[in-house]
Amino acid sequence: MTDRKTNSARDRFMSAICRVAAVALVGSALSGCVAADMALDDVPKAPPQIPAKVLAEMSKKGMKAESPVLVRIFKQESELEVWKMDGSGRYALLKTYPMCRWSGKLGPKTKDGDRQAPEGFYHVSSGMLNPKSQYYVSFNLGYPNRLESALGYTGESLMVHGACSSSGCYALTDQGVGEIYAVVSKALSSGQDRFQVQAYPFRMTPENMALHKDDANLPFWKTLKEGYDAFELTRQQPKVSVCGRRYVFNTEFEGGEPRDPLAACPATAKPSDPQLVAKIALEKQKVEAAVTKASSSTVMSYVDGGMHPSFRQLLKKDGPEKLAARISSIKYPVSRPDAALADPFKAMTKRTGAGQVADAPRGD
């Protein structure tokens, strides 16, 4: 009887893997991970739990597993940060995870099929978590958000998931995304209604902004930097509104939240924190000074997206098959491995005239 049950479970698992392979054949033609992130309902799998090492790190930093969480993503650096609220009521960095793969190039996602990974501000609720993802576990970023929908941007089901494969998603190791999933799931089940994801092209320092001074997305990135600075300066989650075709942060409006993202912003109900406004204004001045001083931007030669240097070294050393086996529990193939070997940002990290890419406080 035991052997019969074992064989039945094995057959269901192999059937699911066959479906995964079939989906993978068409996944590269899709704009997001929607078809490639099917739920494997007949494969028994318990949701990941927070590892003891991560719980110990939380305790060391004055955090509780139940406390609110916030996620930041940086394309150029191929890093994802998990922040937790500590005993002071402010957010502190818990851990930084290297991303194995993201697709497209720097800049927002605007249309179905452009392979772009989203940039902007997103909010993830428990219903957007997938514990039975083909890519181990995943959560949906919620693209397009209200602003993107109003602007006519198209695409759907852009995820953070496991395996080293991306078609508009952010991909990590199964172990890494399992930790992240467990941390955010615990926060959501403990009372946090939804957690904020801030997806950036790079760490939004004046020096990095200057490195991209000639990019057509610079005006959009300056808007993102306002939210970035608000978090950096306060360690509080910024309140995000949308009006005037852009994000607006930490602002109370007469009549409540603006209803039309494309209409001009209504009058404010009360002044924003003057000290914070002054500090953000100073950051804007630093950006303008750095951009003015910098020479023309280096033209980056994109093939397709990026990969954290640690994974690129493994890819060069071991090849895509061994890297896939190391990253993914089902050895899901690395997407476009030849493109992953290219580093379009290498020439930018040590340029004179605009400084180096800044280091953020890092987890272990």
Where are the regions a protein language model picked out?
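Bacterial N-terminal signal peptides that target proteins for export
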Residues: R4-A21
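Bacterial N-terminal signal peptides
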Residues: V20-S31
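Bacterial signal peptide processing site
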Residues: V34-A36
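Short, low-complexity, disordered segments immediately C-terminal to signal peptides
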Residues: M38-P48
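N-terminal post-signal-peptidase region of extra-cytosolic proteins
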Residues: A52-L70, V82-K84, R101-D112, E119-S125, ...
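Short Gly/aromatic-enriched secondary-structure transition segments
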Residues: D86-W102
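Exported/periplasmic cell-wall-interacting domains
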Residues: G113-D273
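Low-complexity, Gly/Ser/Thr/Pro-rich intrinsically disordered linker/tail segments
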Residues: T205-D364
